[in-house]
Amino acid sequence: MAAPQLFRALVSAQWVAEALKSPRASQPLKLLDASWYLPKLGRDARREFEERHIPGAAFFDIDRCSDHTSPYDHMLPSATHFADYAGSLGVSAATHVVIYDGSDQGLYSAPRVWWMFRAFGHHSVSLLDGGFRYWLSQNLPISSGKSPSEPAEFCAQLDPSFIKTHEDILENLDARRFQVVDARAAGRFQGTQPEPRDGIEPGHIPGSVNIPFTEFLTSEGLEKSPEEIQRLFQEKKVDLSKPLVATCGSGVTACHVVLGAFLCGKPDVPVYDGSWVEWYMRAQPEHVISQGRGKTL
């Protein structure tokens, strides 16, 4: 079951390099650099893109393509906003979109944009396995500059099954209708290491399971095999035959859980879009599980 999905979800650096040499008019290829970093890292993703990127790529700004009326970071935008933004980058209904980022891990933020395209009904979307890090390690071509795109017409319609809300997670504390997997680092989940955002304490949602997103990746930054990922879920006592929801700090690395499940033949994992930032800000103190100080009124 995983083999045909693997091709759609992940494409290799060599595949992309060959596709750029031999473009197909029937299904144009569009590369998007979806690099995004936590502010405290001090990295400027757009500037890094302009310094070097895969030829023909456009920069996808996760913060720009988000709901600016929300108090929480980069929540999903409206379908109209997403359609306008994707179209401005040259994406049409016929486009095969391939997404990557420039993180040191291989892939970090790109799975968020892969998930966004699928949530808005565009399933011809893949991730560059290993990201820009692996592309560079293979000495493949790079370009520099702003790389303007020819605008295209793109339509989007949100599939609500891709998202869970705060209310859904709160109700599930008692109902236990779905499992919750948190992709943050273990210390943040346990409450022993600080959150990277001011005013947010570490900890986790009651009953959630921790699988740090880096556990889905090899030391080279490539995605682990479906068999290895299945074992990872099994070791964490996550049952892929039952409903599952992904969360993290702000909805970015949660999409690694979605991708991992997808590669194992489970394409129906939604994301709690507000994730830990929203949960912490809205939760009662007893709903913040932490080995640290947790939350007090």
Curated annotation (Swiss-Prot):
Q: Any idea which residues are catalytic in this one?
A: 248 (cysteine persulfide intermediate)
Residues covered by the Rhodanese domain? 25-144, 174-288
What is this enzyme's class at the first EC digit? Answer: transferase
Known Pfam families for this protein? Rhodanese
Residues recorded with modification N6-acetyllysine: 40
Q: Where in the cell is it found?
A: Cytoplasm; Mitochondrion; Synapse, Synaptosome
Q: Which reaction does it catalyse?
A: 2-oxo-3-sulfanylpropanoate + [thioredoxin]-dithiol = [thioredoxin]-disulfide + hydrogen sulfide + pyruvate + H(+)
**Per the record's keyword annotation, is Zinc included, yes or no?**
no
Phenotype upon changing residue 250 to K: Slight decrease in MST activity; increased rhodanese activity
What is the top-level taxon of the source organism? Eukaryota
Among PROSITE patterns, the record links this protein to: RHODANESE_1, RHODANESE_2, RHODANESE_3
Modified after translation how? The N-terminus is blocked.
The EC code for this enzyme is 2.8.1.2
Q: Which residues carry this modification: Phosphoserine?
A: 35
Q: What is this protein called?
A: 3-mercaptopyruvate sulfurtransferase
What organism does this protein naturally occur in?
Answer: Rattus norvegicus
Gene, per the UniProt record = Mpst
